Amino acid sequence: MDLRVAAYGVVTDEGGRLLLARWTEGRRLAWTLPGGGLEPGEAPEDAVRREIREETGYTVRVGELLGIHSRVIPAGRRVQKASEPLHTLRVVYRAEVTGGKLRYETEGSTDRAEWFSLPAVAELQRVRLVDIALRMAGIL
């Protein structure tokens, strides 16, 4: 079984909007939390800072650990063809923008980043992790 450990941020602004990134590597385009896989030896807090900067242009202060979501994806349901299941551990933090300017990632797994009101999030094509993390944060 393969293992992937990733870190994600629930980033909201003063108006309660949520920062999301549009993921392009799935079976379909879908909005997700900014974040991604840890580099070898990288701490989850550092990974979420790096990934948010890469995907959105913002620098953030990493706050409270909201939770860890564990999921096993059968081999036949993985995005990339594989013979083994994938165990994903997704570490979710609250994060706050401290600087930077909104921009899109180039040559990465996302192609857009945008702020959404919670009612607008409910209408988006999104990955399950968005709702899982919003429940962890007490927003849903």
Question: What residue ranges belong to the model's regions?
Answer:
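NUDIX/MutT-family hydrolases
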Residues: 94, 103-135
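A short coil-to-beta-strand element that immediately follows conserved catalytic motifs
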Residues: 59-68
